[in-house]
Amino acid sequence: MNQQTAPAKSKFSSYQVLVIVLLALTQFTVVLDFMVMSPLGDMLMKSMKLTTSQFGLAVSAYAFSAGISGLLTAGFADKYDRKKLLLFFYIGFIAGTLFCGLTSSYTMLISARIITGLFGGVIGSVSMAIVADLFPMQQRGRVMGFMQMGFGASQVLGIPISLFIANTWGWQSPFFMIVILAVIVWLIISFKMQPVNKHLEIPAERN
């Protein structure tokens, strides 16, 4: 009798592991930047003398601009090397997060959250496109699972650490912490990740 055996799980190469870690860390920083705003609300409102509605608008500004960004980039994202696209949006996210930490007025805060949302809101979809390009079908489920660990870690580890830092050095300090980590990740992506441009070799469909 022929016995059917389940296919063995293919192992990740060292380069694939590096890519997974980098994408998970981008997920960690982007999600933490969004999630940390609400816990910082009390400190931020007292420091900047904001009303609850003003603070709510600052939180919503990120989500709104992220949605707009997703619509705007849908038409051209596939025309570029995904690594370059990730670096572009991630450096914009870093700049917006740094702006959040340096803000001294409500107008600056709203502007910073809009900038952060415009760039950060696309990073997740770019990361998923990279996964689709670099990993075979049988590995993608595991890769996405590892990437989602970045989401969970941002809540389980990132928020408590951020609140501790905020209570010690001020509400701006978590944003600076995110910037430092994100800059390190950006540099590693820049120097270690290979171009992700296989999709550019596929000719566009002709009507």
Where are these regions (language model features)?
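Cytoplasmic helix-loop-helix junction between adjacent transmembrane helices
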Residues: A112-G150
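Flexible cytoplasmic inter-helical loops of multi-pass small-molecule transporters
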Residues: F191-N207
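Conserved MFS/SLC helix-loop-helix module at the cytosolic interface between two early adjacent transmembrane helices
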Residues: I68-S104
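Extracytoplasmic
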Residues: L18-T52
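Paired small-residue
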Residues: G96, T107-I115
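Helix-loop-helix hairpin linking two adjacent transmembrane segments in secondary transporters
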Residues: F146-S190
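Residue-level signature of mid-helix packing/kink "hotspots" within the transmembrane helices
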Residues: M35, A63-L71, Q155-V156
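Membrane-interface helix termini in secondary transporters
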Residues: M43, L71-G75, F164
